[in-house]
């Protein structure tokens, strides 16, 4: 099983990936996560390195959860442990996966906009990532 989340849900995904502590959210569960994928997470809040293969997608123009925070966090985490891959999409904003954000819009002072090229690439990469780590 893998955790996949978007924005605030991506923060939950990274939090669960830190310790594989799925029981924080499902106390009676015996489920174990094997991989995590986070779309535009707030990386500054992710203190501990994920303990499982993790894939992070973010837009270079995201002003809500800035790509620089994820780039810095991944650098701090280093290369020890399970693989962590960060994909930064040039020209993409927060919410790039949501087709209804076309044209883009402001929300709480942040620009949100669909980006079809980023979606196509992220979908392909996510499928490959899940195939690698779940099969």
Model-inferred region functions:
Residues 45, 61-67:
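Short substrate-entry loop that stabilizes the transition state in hydrolases
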Residues 17-21, 78-82, 131-135:
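Sec-exported extracytoplasmic/periplasmic mature domains
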Residues 83-135:
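C-terminal catalytic histidine-bearing segment of alpha/beta-hydrolase fold enzymes
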Residues 56-58:
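Short beta-strand/loop motif that positions the catalytic acidic residue
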Residues 1-51:
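Primarily recognizes the serine-hydrolase "nucleophile elbow" in alpha/beta-hydrolase
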Residues 60-63, 91-93:
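Acidic beta-to-alpha connecting loop that harbors the catalytic carboxylate
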Residues 8, 69-73, 122, 126:
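Stable alpha-helical elements in mature extracytoplasmic
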Residues 52, 66-77:
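Short alpha-helix in the alpha/beta-hydrolase fold that links the catalytic acid
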């Amino acid at each position: 099983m893998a955790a996949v989340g978007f924005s605030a849900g991506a923060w939950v995904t990274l939090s669960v990936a830190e310790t594989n502590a799925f029981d924080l959210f499902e106390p009676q569960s015996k489920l174990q996560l094997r991989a995590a994928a986070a779309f535009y997470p707030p990386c500054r809040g992710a203190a501990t390195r994920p303990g499982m293969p993790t894939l992070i997608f973010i837009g270079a123009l995201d002003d809500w959860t800035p790509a620089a925070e994820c780039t810095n966090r991944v650098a701090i985490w280093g290369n020890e442990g399970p693989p962590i891959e960060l994909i930064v999409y040039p020209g993409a904003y927060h919410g790039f996966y949501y087709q209804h954000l076309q044209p883009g819009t402001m929300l709480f002072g942040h620009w949100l906009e669909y980006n079809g090229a980023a979606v196509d690439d992220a979908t392909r990469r996510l499928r490959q990532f899940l195939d690698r780590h779940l099969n």
